[in-house]
From Swiss-Prot:
Residues 16-29 have a biased composition (Basic residues). This is Putative F-box/kelch-repeat protein At1g13200. It comes from the Eukaryota. Pfam families: F-box (PF00646), FBA_1 (PF07734). It comes from Arabidopsis thaliana.
């Protein structure tokens, strides 16, 4: 045998020994892991449950496959609720941000159902990517994707152009297809033109996902000739549909606001209520509030004067620390002031002023492909969260990214982004599923 052939045989033999050694080590590791995982089964159930409550969702999902008893415990609604309470408390010390958007968007003129949505979870403080989940929604959205705020780790993803209404928990990968709302059925009977979709029907694009005793979807929209329903008890300027998860059905509310809502603004929920801006009437904007528990509407008794007389395109509404916040970007100075509503709903306090025009942002613009310091942009940025170092995480309706604004240095830094990030929200994982 030649020397070259001998060396080849020796190398091959050595490689095979390494592979066999690797297999033995992996088998031994799996046996050890199984022993470790099976040890807690000898503990009392209440002690075991207290231990499990501190585990992250991913670990609990793995544990379910090891024991029928563990699966029964982890999937019980009482355990899910207790785990949710702990997750909310942990969020205060370790806040996270979720970016939700379409994956592999379909390009071209042909209308095809886009079916894959990606969920990217980031650490708020470090901007590091913690997890990525990609889920398939078989019915598709026809490139008109709208995503609600997160409610206990759940999202509602819907499309007015199709009958798609999904509720999803990206942490557990659970999703549920809901029946279409009444207006979705009515609209498709009329087959609106592209112009009618873009102009007339904008108020139907956003819904609220909330929880009182039970979870519910609240869909408030302006009336239109295409969505006249004889079964609706209301013939006013707005209609509201509520989805009941127990009955798996939508129902109309009899009493709805007598003000049309401003179509562009997403609803915000805080302190047990959902809020919408109205269209200007007599050069004044009102705020409609919906009590989640009693399912009744009211107008806020007091609105900040700087907001009430504004063009609705120049103001914004959001939730920070479960408080309703509103902001306006002044046309002269381009400085954006942010006010917070106190729980009594009779006092507004200014909490931040943002001066993006003064920010050097060339690096940020290059990464985000969006000019955050543009001088003639009157639409305000939307605060998403406040970091421990007092920096403010900002999004914008025209940007697919997030930036951190430092009020002390008046500077911004790129946080993260994605070309199709439709929704950017604070988020914590939960086990809540099977609504």
């Amino acid at each position: 045998m030649k020397d070259a052939e001998k060396r080849e045989v020796i190398a091959s033999s050595s490689l095979q020994r390494k592979r066999n050694r690797g297999r033995r080590l992996r088998k031994r590791r799996r046996r050890n892991e199984k022993r470790v995982l099976m040890v807690p089964s000898s503990l009392p159930n209440d002690v075991l449950e207290e231990i499990f409550l501190r585990f992250p969702v991913k670990a609990l999902i793995r544990l379910k496959s090891l024991s029928k008893q563990w699966r029964s415990t982890i999937e019980s609604r009482s355990f899910e609720e207790r785990h949710l309470t702990i997750a909310k408390k942990a969020f205060v010390d370790h806040p996270k941000v979720m970016l939700v958007g379409e994956e592999d968007p379909i390009r071209g003129t042909g209308i095809r159902p886009d079916t894959d949505i990606g969920f990217r979870l980031f650490c708020l403080e470090s901007a590091s990517l913690l997890s990525f989940t990609r889920l398939n929604f078989p019915q598709g959205f026809f490139n008109w994707i709208y995503i609600s705020e997160s409610c206990d780790g759940l999202f509602c993803i819907h499309s007015p152009k199709s009958h798609s209404v999904y509720v999803v928990n990206p942490a557990t990968r659970w999703l549920r297809l809901l029946p279409p709302a009444g207006f979705q059925i009515l609209i498709h009977k009329f087959n609106p033109t592209e112009r009618e979709w873009n102009v007339v029907m904008k108020s139907i694009f956003h819904l609220a996902f909330v929880k009182a005793t039970d979870y519910k979807l609240v869909w408030l929209y302006n009336c239109d000739k295409y969505i006249v329903d004889a079964s609706s008890p209301n013939v006013g300027v707005t209609k509201c549909e509520i989805f009941d998860f127990r009955k798996n059905a939508w129902r109309y509310l009899a009493c709805t606001p007598s003000h049309q809502i401003f179509y562009y603004q997403k609803p915000a929920s805080a302190n047990g209520s959902v809020y919408w801006f109205t269209e200007p009437y007599n050069e004044r904007i009102e705020v409609v509030a919906f009590d989640i528990q009693t399912e009744t509407f009211r107008l806020l008794p007091k609105i900040n004067p700087a907001i009430a007389g504004s063009d609705p395109h120049h103001i914004d509404m959001c939730t920070l620390d479960n408080s309703l916040c509103m902001s306006k970007r002044e046309k002269d100075t381009m400085i954006q002031d942010i006010w917070r509503l106190k729980p009594s709903e009779d006092t507004w306090e200014k909490i931040f002023s943002i001066d993006l025009v003064s920010c050097p942002s060339s690096r940020t613009e290059k990464r985000d492909q969006f000019d955050w310091s543009k001088k003639d942009r009157v639409e305000p940025a939307t605060p998403v969260a406040v970091c421990k170092n007092k920096k403010i995480l900002l999004s914008h309706r025209y940007s697919r990214g997030l930036v951190k604004y430092d009020p002390l240095t008046k500077s911004i830094d790129f946080f993260s982004g994605h070309p199709t990030a439709y929704r950017k929200v604070i988020y914590f994982q939960s086990l809540i599923s099977h609504l």
